[in-house]
From Swiss-Prot:
Full protein name: Small ribosomal subunit protein eS6
Gene Ontology BP annotations: translation
Post-translational modification Phosphoserine, affected residues: 232-233
Organism: Debaryomyces hansenii (strain ATCC 36239 / CBS 767 / BCRC 21394 / JCM 1990 / NBRC 0083 / IGC 2968) (Yeast)
InterPro entries: Ribosomal_eS6, Ribosomal_eS6-like, Ribosomal_eS6_CS
Amino acid sequence: MKLNISYPANGTQKCIDIEDEHKLRVFYEKRMGQEVEGDTVGDEFKGYIFRITGGNDKQGFPMKQGVMHPTRVKLLLAKGHSCYRPRRTGERKRKSVRGCIVAQDLAVLALSVVKQGDSDIEGLTDTTTPKRLGPKRANNIRKFFGLTKEDDVRQFVVRREVVKGDKKYTKAPKIQRLVTPQTLQRKRALKAQKVKNAQQQRDAAAEYAQLLAQRLHERKAERAEIKKRRASSLKA
């Protein structure tokens, strides 16, 4: 069985192949999310504590959290479920997944380091892989660098170097939800336009109501005049 160990603190991961069944017994009958001591796995893992985050069997079927079964099962999955991505709106499909209990027929078991042990593991805890991209939203940039609302966020955007042929330049993401005098002016202009449109609609409605009342009054007067003429002709 292969152990795919990740170390989120450093952003690194390493895949280790273990053939001795006795070393793997500590993981059997354990569920996803449970923590396991790494002393029995090997001397280099002494003092380490791992959390089981997932795995898949030799046919590639992944483990699914919440399915209390050590073997493969078929479930009707929809949007929002793990181990399934719908291709159409409202689509559901019956898919084969493994339960969340670790069994012997797994090919790869995914682990995450919760507590570091006595010694470093080469390629896992002794190296650091920095994040390729920094935060993009204005509030997240402020939180990341500990800035106040008065500080200019645009000076602190994480830029990355790009090499294209002989040219070397830097790229920065577009800051989302950035409040600038220009955006505030646009907001005020939009609000003023809405108020203006509403006033125009009210004026048009009042003008139409006035015209309608005038037409009704004219029609009423016209009918009264016709009645008057008929009455006078009958008398004559």
